[in-house]
From Swiss-Prot:
Belongs to the ATPase delta chain family. InterPro entries: ATP_synth_OSCP/delta_N_sf, ATPase_OSCP/d_CS, ATPase_OSCP/dsu. It is found in: Cell inner membrane. The lineage of its organism: Bacteria, Pseudomonadati, Pseudomonadota, Alphaproteobacteria, Hyphomicrobiales. GO terms for molecular function: proton-transporting ATP synthase activity, rotational mechanism. Pfam families: OSCP (PF00213). The keyword Chloroplast does not apply. One of its GO terms (cellular component) is proton-transporting ATP synthase complex. F(1)F(0) ATP synthase produces ATP from ADP in the presence of a proton or sodium gradient. F-type ATPases consist of two structural domains, F(1) containing the extramembraneous catalytic core and F(0) containing the membrane proton channel, linked together by a central stalk and a peripheral stalk. During catalysis, ATP synthesis in the catalytic domain of F(1) is coupled via a rotary mechanism of the central stalk subunits to proton translocation. This protein is part of the stalk that links CF(0) to CF(1). It either transmits conformational changes from CF(0) to CF(1) or is implicated in proton conduction. It is a peripheral membrane protein. Keywords: ATP synthesis, Cell inner membrane, Cell membrane, CF(1), Hydrogen ion transport, Ion transport, Membrane, Transport. F-type ATPases have 2 components, F(1) - the catalytic core - and F(0) - the membrane proton channel. F(1) has five subunits: alpha(3), beta(3), gamma(1), delta(1), epsilon(1). F(0) has three main subunits: a(1), b(2) and c(10-14). The alpha and beta chains form an alternating ring which encloses part of the gamma chain. F(1) is attached to F(0) by a central stalk formed by the gamma and epsilon chains, while a peripheral stalk is formed by the delta and b chains. This is ATP synthase subunit delta.
């Protein structure tokens, strides 16, 4: 990995890289990714779990016991459960969402995929998602994974971030451009 990817730098990048290498050796990359995606969804759905993970108020012992109970109840095992327990023991559980993001980036790079961060004003239907994926694939020549975020403040259009490139065709940006042009003219 000669090229440094900003999405896998820092503490979270080191943990993600270690987990990725371990999963690659075990030939369990897809299983670990699925587990991490599920854990990420659990964090999004449970404010209590998110608080346990992110709050420094909980002691290491309390955090470890609570996480072990959550992992057991949710049916996590193997590499992912051990990894999350290591994060907890090292007092780095607060960084788990960044670790998951970095792990996803490593998996995408390994599979030759490119992840596009797409911001839209309203949820896109499958037809529009497929059309966007096809258009981006024709530009990059690689498989595309879309991470879609809905942000009504862009009013309309979309913002696409693909690596270091960004295309902002949002209505908000166009209106701001017109507003600035009118201020300069008048």
């Amino acid at each position: 990995m000669a090229a440094v990817d900003s999405s896998v730098s820092g503490v979270s990048g080191r943990y993600a890289t270690a987990l990725f290498e371990l999963a690659r050796e075990d030939k369990s990359i897809d299983a670990v990714k699925a587990d991490l995606d599920r854990f990420d969804a659990m964090l999004a759905d449970s404010p209590e779990l998110a608080r346990l993970v992110r709050s420094p108020v909980f002691s290491a012992d309390t955090q470890a016991k609570a996480l072990a109970a959550v992992l057991d109840k949710a049916g996590f095992g193997g590499t992912t459960a051990k990894f999350l327990k290591v994060l907890t023991a090292n007092r780095r559980l607060f960084a788990v969402t960044e670790v998951i993001r970095a792990f996803r980036a490593l998996v995408a790079r390994f599979k030759g995929e490119v992840t596009a961060e797409v911001t839209v004003a309203e949820t896109l239907n499958k037809k529009n998602l497929d059309a966007l994926t096809t258009a981006l694939k024709s530009v990059t020549g690689k498989d595309i994974t879309l991470n879609v975020k809905v942000d009504p403040s862009i009013i309309g259009g979309l913002v696409v971030k693909l690596g270091s490139r960004m295309v902002d065709s949002s209505l908000r940006t166009k209106l701001n451009s017109i507003k600035h042009a009118m201020k300069e003219a008048g």
